[in-house]
């Protein structure tokens, strides 16, 4: 007789779960007929990750930060953390998209999702031009290495002056950073010594 309440509650639980099981079975049976295109109405809506553009290299952290709108730059070394969305679903790429991106010019920094997004286009193209200028300057430096400027003319002299100024400026910045670190280290040591002597006096 003691088993009657337990048996009754067990039957109650089974019958309460039965309609849900029947509905689930009906959904499973109608799924293949409809092609599985319609999602279940009870499925929760998940936000899709919208990308402003797609970077040609994921090692380009600035591009990744610019293109992926929901990623917040967190100051951890070599780490970008998606923050606040709980890893939303991403749309799958088709083979056409894959071959289209392979066929595009790899010198572009990124590829914009919208053709009307002028800021995105300028971001992707300007960086390409800057990289072209850098490579031209590198080629110019390689060309004038070991050569006297009398052969190359005024342009060579100007480049040498600019390069000399840049090197001096970089050296000055490097030295100021080193001295700032030394001063901070000395201050930390003095503070530590004061703290130790203060603890000993009391």
Curated annotation (Swiss-Prot):
The keyword Transferase does not apply. GO terms for molecular function: endothelin A receptor binding; endothelin B receptor binding; hormone activity. The keyword Disulfide bond applies. The record marks 73-74 as: Cleavage. Disulfide bonds join 53-67, 55-63. Residues 26-50, 74-202 form a propeptide. It is found in: Secreted. Its main location: secreted. Keywords: Cleavage on pair of basic residues, Disulfide bond, Secreted, Signal, Vasoactive, Vasoconstrictor. Residues 28-48 are annotated as: Disordered. Residues 1-25 form the signal peptide. Residues 110-124 are annotated as: Endothelin-like. InterPro entries: Endothelin, Endothelin_toxin_CS, Endothln-like_toxin. PANTHER family: ENDOTHELIN, ENDOTHELIN-1. Endothelins are endothelium-derived vasoconstrictor peptides. Probable ligand for G-protein coupled receptors EDNRA and EDNRB which activates PTK2B, BCAR1, BCAR3 and, GTPases RAP1 and RHOA cascade in glomerular mesangial cells. Also binds the DEAR/FBXW7-AS1 receptor. Promotes mesenteric arterial wall remodeling via activation of ROCK signaling and subsequent colocalization of NFATC3 with F-actin filaments. NFATC3 then translocates to the nucleus where it subsequently promotes the transcription of the smooth muscle hypertrophy and differentiation marker ACTA2. This is Endothelin-1. The lineage of its organism: Eukaryota, Metazoa, Chordata, Craniata, Vertebrata.
